UniProtKB/Swiss-Prot annotation:
Disulfide bonds join 225-273, 315-352, 450-454. One of its GO terms (biological process) is proteolysis. Residues 33-136 form a propeptide. Residues 147-465 form the Peptidase S8 domain. It comes from Xanthomonas campestris pv. campestris (strain ATCC 33913 / DSM 3586 / NCPPB 528 / LMG 568 / P 25). Residues 1-32 form the signal peptide. Its EC number is 3.4.21.-. This is Extracellular protease. One of its GO terms (cellular component) is extracellular region. Belongs to the peptidase S8 family.
Length: 580
């Protein structure tokens, strides 16, 4: 083995000269208390803080000294609407720290300013957020154990920790499909929809378009839908897809839904022998809050549209215009890649622009044999042996049931559900483009084989939700995403050779910039550079260690720094933090 092929095994790299060390020591007061900023990432605003004063400090013995300490710190936060911030003691905790409360909610920047000012008091030992903790959720649905996509293997969605942070509450997912049947494990999450099938024969309800999105059944006899096409029973496809998105969860019954706090608007476009492009285009417009002549407005415009449907050919002008309109109204459009085991470039509407095209994976984390593939795939998701809500009828609706289906039709609603989770916790609604970037940047590499192209990887629900809560896009993104001082970006991952890029601007007088990576699996290499993006050969700091525990420390760092994580080997679950 040549020396060039050996990886360096070094400690963290510190860019520090002797004179710089002297000035650093002078700039960092020995009495400064510890500031725990991790809690800032748990919510968008904060109002209560825990301040630990040193033994023997006057603030512990004198209420007036405590009041003075709090008022001094509060003055560091700019006034709002002409009113200075108030900060008062609530009570002393059993272990001695003081619980204090601001008289208004503080955003993260304000909270950090306050915490640092509190810690500057020589009497203070530490400051932390009085953050809100939650019970961890394992739903009690009786068939959850059969839903491998919601399990704990690295082939699944990594959704259980995401459910502790988000349920999709307040979001709407439009399922453009065969309509829906009544199901006790689904009904509570269904809003009023619409039947857009204009042909009475296809619709089977005898009256064309109407406000009843019920699935009448899509069965057909041999040769009825074309010469040589065998007979088929009703699929209840829309009911299955809707259950994957938002089945009622934690109800001691049946299955769980990806975004079980979300609501579903069923939009019927597929009936006997399929559905027309013209009907589907109108349905996209309506579902996203657009106007369709002669049709009442949608009272619940969707943040997300799921289309588990498709056909051959290039993306038509009609379909593309409908999708573009939906995206312009802020609706993310998620589409099944198709089940032809061929390049997605030949599958409409997955080959349209402005959609998230989803390939299907197996429980082993490999591309499903039937799934379409190619450079047009954006992400992958579980699609094989997916258990969801169904109906027992072979033609017309019978009783509610459950069944497992295979297909990219099953993968797509998993992604639509994750989008609902993301939008439900984002500080402000993300644009469809930002949603796509976030999903790609937080995706996990397939643990199994994929030939032909499976996009950025398997959607990682927890990483996506965490990135949304933190107001970021999870990494990557060409020009880089902005890091917040002291706030970790978690759940990062990339395939071998890929990279994630960030920036952070450090104000003058900050003393030291420390950038760290930690946790997870695989091997991510950290690069930091002042003023421009680092490369393999140009950087200010590159620890170049095996694994993910790397640190760059830079003194007198005012200015913009570019941070790069490059996958020496596929990594996932990595945390990145920059602080000054």
């Amino acid at each position: 083995m040549s020396t060039a092929s050996l990886r360096k095994r070094t400690g963290s790299l510190t860019i520090l000269g002797a004179s710089a060390l002297t000035s650093l020591l002078l700039a960092m007061p020995a009495f400064a208390g510890e500031v725990y900023l991790d809690g800032l990432a748990t919510a968008q605003t904060h109002q209560k803080f825990i301040v630990t004063y040193k033994d023997g400090s006057t603030a512990l013995a004198s209420p007036s000294a405590l009041t003075t300490s709090l008022r001094t710190a509060a003055r560091a936060v700019p006034a709002k609407a002409g009113k200075a911030l108030g900060l008062n003691s609530v009570r002393r905790l059993a272990l001695g720290p003081e619980l204090v409360r601001a008289d208004r909610a503080l955003d993260r920047a304000e909270a950090e300013t306050l915490m640092r000012q509190l810690a500057a008091d020589p009497n203070v030992q530490s400051v932390e957020v009085d953050q809100i903790l939650h019970a961890t959720l394992t739903p009690n649905d009786t068939r959850l154990s059969e839903q491998w996509a919601f399990g704990t293997t690295n082939a699944g969605l990594n959704i259980r920790p995401a459910w502790d942070k988000a349920t999709g509450s307040g979001t709407v997912v439009a399922v453009i499909d065969t309509g829906i049947t009544s199901h006790a494990d689904l009904n509570a999450n269904i809003l009023a929809g619409y039947d857009f099938i204009s042909d009475a024969t296809t619709a089977r309800d005898g009256n064309g378009r109407d406000s009843n999105a019920a699935d009448e059944g899509d069965w057909y006899a041999a040769n009825e839908c074309g010469a040589g096409i065998p007979a088929a029973s009703s699929s209840w496809h829309g009911t299955h897809v809707a259950g994957t998105v938002a089945a009622v969860t934690n109800n001691t019954t049946g299955v769980a839904g990806t975004a079980y706090g979300a609501k579903v608007v069923p939009v019927r476009v597929l009936g006997k022998c399929g559905g027309s492009l013209s009907d589907i285009a109108d349905a996209i417009v309506w579902a996203s809050g657009g106007t369709v002549s002669g049709i009442p407005a949608n009272a619940n415009p969707a943040e997300v549209i799921n289309m588990s449907l498709g056909g051959g050919g290039s993306c038509s002008t009609t379909m593309q215009n409908a999708i573009n309109g939906a995206v312009s109204r802020g609706t993310t459009v998620v589409v099944a890649a198709g089940n032809d085991a061929s390049n997605v470039s030949g599958s409409l509407p997955a080959n349209c622009a402005n959609v998230i095209a989803v390939a299907a994976t197996t429980s082993a984390g490999a591309k499903a044999s039937y799934s379409n593939f190619g450079t047009g795939i954006d992400v992958s998701a579980p699609g094989s042996s997916i258990l969801s809500t169904l109906n027992s009828g072979t033609t017309t609706p019978g009783s509610a049931s459950y069944a497992s289906y295979n297909g990219t039709s099953m993968a797509s609603p998993h992604v639509a559900g994750v989008v609902a989770l993301v939008q439900s916790v984002a500080p402000t609604a993300l644009t469809p483009a930002a949603v796509e970037t976030l999903l790609k940047n937080t995706a996990r590499a397939l643990p199994g084989a994929c030939s032909g192209g499976c996009g950025a990887g398997i959607v990682n629900a927890d990483a996506a939700v965490t990135a949304a809560i933190n107001g970021g896009s999870g990494g990557g993104g060409g020009g880089g995403n902005t890091l917040t001082n002291g706030t970790p970006v978690t759940g990062l991952g990339a395939a071998t050779g890929a990279e994630l890029n960030y920036t952070i601007t450090v104000p003058a007088g900050s003393g030291t910039l420390t950038v760290t990576t930690s946790g997870g699996s695989g091997d991510a290499d950290l690069y930091v550079r002042a003023g421009s993006a680092p490369t393999d050969s140009a950087y200010t700091c590159r620890p170049y260690r095996s694994g993910n525990a790397e640190t760059c420390t830079i003194t007198a760092p005012s200015g913009t720094y570019y941070v790069r994580l490059k996958a020496y080997s596929t990594f996932s679950g990595v945390t990145l933090r920059a602080s000054y």
